[in-house]
Amino acid sequence: MPKVIGLTGGIASGKSTVSELLSVFGFKVVDADKAAREAVKKGSKGLAQVREVFGDEAIDENGEMNRRYMGDLVFNHPEKRLELNAIIHPIVRDIMEEEKQEYLKQGYNVIMDIPLLFENELENTVDEVWVVYTSESIQMDRLMQRNNLSLEDAKARVYSQISIDKKSRMADHVIDNLGDKLELKQNLERLLEEEGYIEKPNYGEED
């Protein structure tokens, strides 16, 4: 019977890389970030609701959501984050549920790629939770390089989520991403072998 696995981690923990690798191994990935973008795409009901609640500043000159404006707004005003989530989350849930059910019907194991799985208390909607683990210092380094953030901004984003250590304690399985991409792939393969998703290589004996 196909399984539904929740994949999560801290910001800049390497979760996207793990998602890509899992799709190579035959899993179907349902991406919460992708669903969130679809929920407020140009011309959508979701975007119309955003404009109604947050005003014209929330929409850029191309008729799309002004992500920089909205990002700063919700990051600095928690009550605004709740208002935005109240618009987006129900739409995202519907998009993801439809995609998940379609894959399950086809017999695939499904990865629900959800960055804020624990924060939104969604762990009971999946069969297992896998956490991609790295250290907070690596998270901050990656954020500063990837997003061109100051150390203070990187810290603020890391600390706005449940800590990676706590998430790891709450997970069914932890995927170590303290090393490079090759080590990450090897760690993931080991987990997939142990859980029976892929076969262990049988090198046999030479004659």
Curated annotation (Swiss-Prot):
GO molecular function: ATP binding; dephospho-CoA kinase activity
SUPFAM superfamilies: P-loop containing nucleoside triphosphate hydrolases
PROSITE patterns according to UniProt: DPCK
Name of a matching Pfam family: CoaE
GO CC, alphabetical: cytoplasm
Annotated keywords: ATP-binding, Coenzyme A biosynthesis, Cytoplasm, Kinase, Nucleotide-binding, Transferase
Pathway as given in its UniProt record: Cofactor biosynthesis; coenzyme A biosynthesis; CoA from (R)-pantothenate: step 5/5
Chief localization: cytoplasm
Segments crossing the lipid bilayer: none
Statement: the UniProt record of this protein carries the keyword Lipid metabolism: no
GO biological process: coenzyme A biosynthetic process
Reaction equations catalysed: 3'-dephospho-CoA + ATP = ADP + CoA + H(+)
Keyword DNA-binding: no
Subcellular location: Cytoplasm
UniProt superkingdom: Bacteria
Residue stretches making up the DPCK domain: 4-203
Binding site for ATP: 12-17
Function statement: Catalyzes the phosphorylation of the 3'-hydroxyl group of dephosphocoenzyme A to form coenzyme A.
Official protein name in the record: Dephospho-CoA kinase
Native organism taxonomy: Bacteria, Bacillati, Bacillota, Bacilli, Bacillales
Gene name in the database record: coaE
